[in-house]
């Protein structure tokens, strides 16, 4: 009767180990945790089950405790397993970076950072107040925080449970004390600090259905209002987690999160410890299964809740790894448009005083390999280009071109889907005199990000947040070359130098759902400045057919790591900036083409274009036809 539920829980408990093996990008050196029992990784000895350290979550069939959310999150970020150990445990060695201790109040959390960390038995338990182990606090004795680490902070519940919060003023003061811990970390050098909002204590088995439910819900809200206000004044990247809203969504639609939809999820629990054990999914129920329940005991979540919170935190951290690829999509569209112009420039010039019209269509493939702060992605694109040119004299040809490009990018672990429609217009000029030649183009474009769907794991299912936005693109490009062979030769070989400038702006936007996971993003700008050298060659293989080839090496001067400023749409006043994609400084590009004169003045051409940097590959094919008149 227990086999299937226990199997499900065993698989859930393996999430930590599996996530470490499959860890995605992470710009953080490690994860450092401060807080209370909601994040305690095993500070206290396990006096019942004999495991190295007790955690305030449910046990599996073998008696092992489920991981807490920072352990799961750290695994997904690729943090070393030893770093996820508790800091001051009696039984788990060596010491890790998780300083959270069950029973800690907001003052004790602050003390564990600035003065002394103690594993002390909390009030209400046998031997309350007994210190099992202590060590200097994280920043004690003048130590500094790791600026490249991610800090994880939760707390406040024990101020209520231990009778320290009895009024709105008490709740405001407790919220300010938790914010003081974030302030202390920032003053010590921390840059990235993730902070829980306090769950609604009225919506826990300990207080649900009691006269204290509504007052505690109001006091929890007062705590959070104070906390958010204080966090907004700290000069660091404070990443809030709207845990109350997340849990309310789980309670409103439990089946979407794999929870039982026919059970009282806030009035019952799994273990029966200081709460009513669920008769169906409780540990002694007819079908024991902690993944179907939100609470393990009177106030602590099961593995289902811990996984949900870890996924929520990861979805926020991972968002810029995908969203900073939006400007790169636009740059890819610009490059495809410029490639089409260069392809067209290889066709024979029309006679002086004549026009030449052309139309071309192509397809592109775009691949981003993962970086330490950017997701991998696979893109597909299609374009249509039309234009014309007029030959002024023997040396000059001027023209205009317009293009439409549709691009789709799948990025990240859950295949988020981003679509871009871009519309480009260019004016260009070509020059050739004796053996010298040159070309230049000015391009402007409108960007229509019509369907942006960010998808991520959230519990047992995926969730998507959607939005749309616009943008603009500007570019200038030029080449100067010298033909080594005379114009009358059947072959041409021309070394050249090139210069390119491009600027893309993606307007900020908010995802539309209004849920806990919905994010808002500020404007993004990405500029590219490149210089290059290359060789352009051609050979006349038949009287009406010519083959072309080009290879170039370019250096990108704008290769700084990109970032994006963002906020939870449910907490719009608290924004933060996180890092994302990093352009590479060296780029190789090459092209092959053939032009064939069908009849006098009508040319058919085909081209293949390829670009490669360390983690970016773009390639495309196109077919075009031009007509002189």
UniProtKB/Swiss-Prot annotation:
EC number of the protein: 3.1.1.1, 3.1.2.2
Alphabetical UniProt keywords: Cell outer membrane, Hydrolase, Membrane, Serine esterase, Signal, Transmembrane, Transmembrane beta strand
Annotated compartments: Cell outer membrane
Catalytic activity: a carboxylic ester + H2O = an alcohol + a carboxylate + H(+); hexadecanoyl-CoA + H2O = hexadecanoate + CoA + H(+)
GO BP of this protein: lipid metabolic process
Active site annotation, chain numbering: 37 (nucleophile), 297, 300
Pfam families for this protein: Autotransporter, Lipase_GDSL
GO cellular component labels: cell outer membrane
Class of enzymatic activity (EC top level): hydrolase
Transmembrane feature ranges: 382-392, 395-405, 422-431, 436-445, 473-484, 491-501, 531-541, 545-554, 589-598, 602-611, 620-629
CDD domains: Triacylglycerol_lipase_like
Membrane topology (UniProt): Multi-pass membrane protein
Principal localisation: membrane
Function: Esterase that catalyzes the hydrolysis of p-nitrophenyl esters of acyl chain lengths C4-C10 and Tween detergents. Also has a pronounced thioesterase activity towards palmitoyl-coenzyme A.
Family the entry assigns: Belongs to the 'GDSL' lipolytic enzyme family.
Domain notes: Contains a C-terminal autotransporter domain that integrates into the outer membrane and enables the translocation of the catalytic N-terminal domain to the bacterial cell surface.
Protein name, per record: Esterase EstP
Protein source organism: Pseudomonas putida (strain ATCC 47054 / DSM 6125 / CFBP 8728 / NCIMB 11950 / KT2440)
């Amino acid at each position: 009767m227990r086999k299937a539920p226990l199997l499900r829980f065993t698989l859930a408990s393996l999430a930590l180990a599996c996530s470490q093996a499959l860890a995605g990008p992470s710009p953080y050196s490690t994860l450092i945790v401060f807080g209370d029992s909601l994040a305690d990784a095993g500070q206290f000895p396990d006096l019942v089950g004999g495991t190295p350290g007790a955690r305030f979550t449910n046990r599996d069939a073998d008696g092992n405790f489920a991981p807490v959310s920072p352990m799961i999150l750290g695994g997904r970020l690729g943090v070393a397993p030893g770093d996820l150990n508790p800091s001051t445990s009696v039984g788990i060695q060596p010491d890790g970076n998780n300083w959270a201790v069950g029973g800690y109040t907001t003052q004790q959390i602050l003390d564990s950072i600035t003065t002394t960390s103690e594993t002390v038995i909390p009030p209400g338990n046998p031997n309350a107040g007994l210190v099992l182990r202590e060590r200097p606090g994280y920043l004690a004795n003048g130590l500094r925080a790791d600026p490249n680490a991610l800090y994880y902070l939760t707390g406040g519940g024990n101020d209520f449970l231990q009778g320290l919060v009895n009024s709105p003023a008490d709740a405001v003061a407790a919220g300010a004390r938790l914010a003081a811990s974030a302030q202390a970390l920032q003053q010590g050098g921390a840059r990235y600090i993730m902070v829980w909002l306090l769950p609604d204590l009225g919506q826990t088995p300990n207080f649900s259905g009691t006269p204290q439910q509504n007052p505690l819900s109001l006091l929890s809200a007062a705590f959070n209002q104070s906390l958010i206000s204080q966090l907004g004044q700290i000069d660091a990247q404070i990443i809030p987690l709207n845990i109350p809203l997340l849990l309310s969504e789980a309670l409103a639609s439990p089946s979407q999160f794999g929870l039982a939809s026919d059970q009282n999820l806030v009035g019952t629990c799994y273990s029966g410890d200081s709460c009513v054990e669920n008769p169906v999914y409780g540990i002694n129920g007819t079908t024991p299964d902690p993944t179907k329940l939100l609470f393990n005991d009177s106030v602590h979540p099961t593995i289902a809740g811990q996984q949900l919170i870890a996924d929520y935190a990861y979805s926020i951290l991972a968002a810029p790894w995908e969203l900073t690829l939006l400007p790169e999509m636009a740059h890819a569209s610009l490059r495809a448009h410029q490639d089409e112009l260069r392809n067209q420039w290889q066709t024979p010039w029309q006679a002086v005083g004549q026009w030449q019209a052309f139309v071309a269509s192509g397809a592109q493939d775009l691949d981003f390999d993962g970086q330490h702060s950017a997701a991998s992605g696979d893109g597909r694109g299609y374009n249509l280009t039309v234009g014309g040119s007029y030959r002024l004299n023997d040396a000059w040809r001027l023209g205009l071109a317009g293009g439409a490009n549709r691009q789709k990018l799948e990025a990240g672990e859950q295949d988020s889907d981003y679509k871009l429609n871009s519309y480009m217009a260019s004016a260009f000029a070509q020059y050739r005199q004796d053996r010298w030649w040159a070309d230049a183009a000015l391009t402007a474009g409108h960007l229509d990000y019509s369907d942006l769907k960010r998808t991520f794991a959230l519990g047992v299912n995926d969730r998507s947040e959607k939005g749309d936005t616009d943008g603009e693109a500007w570019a200038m490009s030029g080449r100067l070359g010298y033909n080594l062979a005379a114009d009358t030769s059947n072959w041409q070989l021309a070394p050249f130098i090139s210069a390119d400038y491009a600027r893309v702006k993606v307007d900020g936007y908010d995802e539309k759902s209004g849920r806990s996971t919905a994010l808002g993003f500020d404007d993004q700008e990405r500029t590219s400045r490149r210089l290059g050298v290359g060789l352009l060659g051609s050979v006349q293989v038949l009287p009406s057919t010519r083959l072309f080839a080009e290879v170039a090496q370019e250096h990108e001067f704008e290769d700084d790591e990109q970032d994006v400023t963002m906020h939870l749409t449910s907490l719009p006043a608290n924004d933060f900036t996180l890092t994302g994609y990093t352009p590479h400084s060296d780029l190789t590009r090459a092209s092959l083409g053939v032009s064939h004169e069908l009849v006098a003045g009508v040319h058919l051409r085909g081209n293949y274009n390829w670009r490669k940097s360390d983690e970016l590959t773009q390639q495309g094919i196109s077919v075009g036809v031009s007509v002189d008149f």
